[in-house]
Amino acid sequence: MALSPLAGKPAPKELLIDPAQLEREYYTRAPDPSDPAQQVSFGTSGHRGSPLRGSFNEAHIVATAQAMCEYRQAQGITGPHFIGRDTHAVSILAQRTALEVLAANGVEIVIQSDDEFTPTPALSRAILVHNRGRTDRLADGVVVTPSHNPPEDGGFKYNPPNGGPADTDATGWIQRRANELLREGNRSAKRIPLAAAQRAANYHEQDFRMPYVQDLRHVIDMEAIRAAGLKLAVDPLGGAAVHYWEPINSVYGLDIDVVNPRVDPTFAFMTVDHDGKIRMDSSSPYAMASLLGLKDRFQLAFANDTDADRHGIVTPSTGLLNPNHYLTVAIHYLLNARPQWRRDAAIGKTLVSSSMIDRVVAAAGRRLLETPVGFKWFAPGLLDGSVCFGGEESTGASFLRQDGTVWTTDKDGIILALLAAEITARTGKEPGQYYWDLTTQFGTPHYTRIDAPATPEQKARLGKLSPDAVRASSLAGEPITAKLTRAPGNDQPIGGLKVVTENGWFAARPSGTENLYKIYAESQRDTRHLQTLVAEAQQIVAESLRS
């Protein structure tokens, strides 16, 4: 995909959304239930869409919230329902709609007091704290967020009582019922006016923020960061964590400069992403251009996306740290710095993450759990302590408390940012330097991800390939040692293909939102070998789809 001439530059006025137009479209546009693009569709992070495309409108949220209430009843979930939102313009609208439906269904609602924002990890933690030691009246929740997606988008993400992203059984149930309701015009959905919902006996306000902040000492060595006197910076990218960082400063005596405290639903302060869109992606050097420009003023800087489940780490030596590099550093450090963690607890990684992680885990004598893409696969293990760290190459991760018990079962960009500061404080090396030291022991892998065009039919075939569809016996001059369509760690379908050789691998997966597929590839040799891997990967995928 060609790089936009606007990439990395301040967003021009022409790119800014009109929040009033979004609100009108949200309430007045009626989706077409016969159009798949306008139906409720749960991906790896809930239902997403835009009022402007007829894919995230009031009708969708009425249907989804009602379906969720019915799912709770079917599953015997009778405890409180925690609901939070990020800073996207549509999020507050969808949250209000959901409150009207939840209250009408008699669900016990718990919402952040003072109409404040709620990061995904704070909500996950709140669910787990409520459910600790309980066997009945278990809590669940929703975060209204499209994550780092553009300002015109909305999202609705369900977290069951395990606190993590819902599994496909739950999302499939809710999606099917929501679309039934959508087709019938939501006639069977229950709903009361917002004012009545907020006066109802089952509506409660609670502070999620300070309990989360005060509990951080049990997952991060905050005293080490304070004692080191590190000069730190954070850019919340206008997201839900924006009002968490000053309390973290004051509670722990840290020196974190919140360089951009603005909240603006147009996200006019952002620099433009690679494709010419505004996107609050903390892993993109283009979206992170403003913070990168400040890298030499601080010993370490970091950012989160709008629901704070992702992280971006900026160091003076490397600039924006490659997500795979930081995952490797975090895992290596934690396996040496958390002696109370169970020795048999696994490190969870998705199969498109770097194989450098495999080598670090093997050298530590620990178990690797390689899963399909999606943080939901790590949630059960994080909950019971059988997984001590779970991470995705898309900059989402979480890990256990220092005592080896659960912290969150959803991604937590705040603790990954603070972990970078802990690593710097306790080792004297910022994460960029730490990674390059690791390469002297484990080698220097070369990794890339590219997009390739695909029709909807080709995407569907790619998602259902069998290993037999790959006829090639070699890749980039080496014998193929594995052809995978199911993940080694849990034998779940990967929704694509992974091909492995001694010194390289590639994986191909269809995009969930665009007519393209993604190729991930890594070489243990050099960039030329990587280029050959990618070229042959495209040939193998094309031949497999034809067959």
Language model: regions and residue ranges:
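Proline/glycine-rich low-complexity loops and linkers
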Residues: 112-117, 176-207, 315-391, 396-399
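Short glycine-rich or small-residue beta-strand-to-loop segments that form or flank ligand, phosphate
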Residues: 50-51, 80-86, 231-234, 314, ...
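Glycine-rich phosphate/diphosphate-binding loops that line cofactor/substrate pockets in enzymes
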Residues: 65-81, 221-228, 295
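Conserved phosphate/anionic-ligand binding catalytic regions in large, soluble enzymes, centered on
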Residues: 37-56, 146-149, 236-247, 306-308, ...
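Phosphate-binding and adjacent anionic-ligand microenvironments
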Residues: 300, 337-520, 526-547
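N-terminal small/polar loop signature for handling phosphorylated ligands or for N-terminal nucleophile
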Residues: 13, 20, 77-153, 247-312
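Gly/Ser/Thr-enriched, mixed-charge loops and adjacent short helices
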Residues: 2-38, 134-135, 152-294
